[in-house]
Regions:
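Predominantly the structural core of cysteine protease catalytic domains
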Residues: 21, 26-29, 49-58, 72, ...
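Alpha-helical support elements that line or immediately flank enzyme active sites
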Residues: 42-66
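Short, intrinsically disordered, charge-biased short linear motifs at domain edges
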Residues: 14, 31-37, 121
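A short glycine/serine-rich beta->alpha loop
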Residues: 34-46, 88-92
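N-terminal zymogen propeptides
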Residues: 1-26
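Short, flexible coil/linker elements and helix-boundary hinge sites characteristic
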Residues: 9, 15, 65-66, 110
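Short, glycine/acidic-rich hinge or "gate" loops at secondary-structure transitions
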Residues: 65-73
Length: 184
């Protein structure tokens, strides 16, 4: 069930789980319905983790409502409330990176999600107000992988719940060029 809006519009997802993976699958067109929202620009804010999490949640809501509810959720509110300048935050500084643990904590603690229209994204801002969350989030699926070829959990999540959020760690040490290189 998804409760949405002040009228508490109720959407029912019958819980059908698909276990067979098709040869190809595109969330942008599943039986002429898109389960992804528009691409957003984080600029140089170091907040990809927040954008990834909100895009996955927006996709999950689209998937659960068969495209009936499309939301633009606030990455700004998430990244600021989970940083060191917030009473709910961690030791992470704002705008210099994060991870899925932060986004999951924000959502399951009831701090969000909130709409983008309440707290617009500004790449280098540090503070956000606390708003009532749009809906309650629970049962976040955390996918473990045994190695880089173990992708069935990701396929299962894409097929049944929508987009996924993926964390990765980049450090200046990766720029050494000996056997790996990252420049971002």
């Amino acid at each position: 069930y998804i409760f949405y809006d002040n009228d508490y519009e109720l959407f029912y997802n019958d819980g059908t789980i698909l276990n067979e993976f098709p040869e190809s699958y595109d969330l942008r067109n599943v039986s002429n319905v898109s389960f992804v929202t528009n691409v957003k620009n984080q600029g140089n804010g170091g907040n990809c983790w927040s954008f990834s999490a909100m895009a996955a949640l927006e996709s999950a809501i689209l998937k659960a409502t068969n495209g009936a509810v499309s939301l633009d959720l606030s990455e700004e509110n998430m990244k600021n409330l989970m940083a060191c300048f917030s009473p709910f935050g961690t030791t992470y500084e704002t705008n210099v990176g994060g991870n899925d643990r932060l986004s999951n904590a924000y959502l399951t603690a009831g701090l969000g999600p909130v709409l983008e229209s309440l707290d617009n994204y500004v790449p280098k801002d540090y503070l956000s107000a606390i708003f009532n969350p749009l809906t309650h989030i629970q049962n976040i699926l955390w996918i473990d992988r045994s190695d880089y070829l173990d992708n069935d959990g990701i396929k299962f999540a894409l097929l049944n719940y929508g987009a996924v959020s993926v964390s990765c760690n980049f450090d200046r040490d990766y720029r050494n060029g000996a056997n790996h290189y990252y420049y971002g």
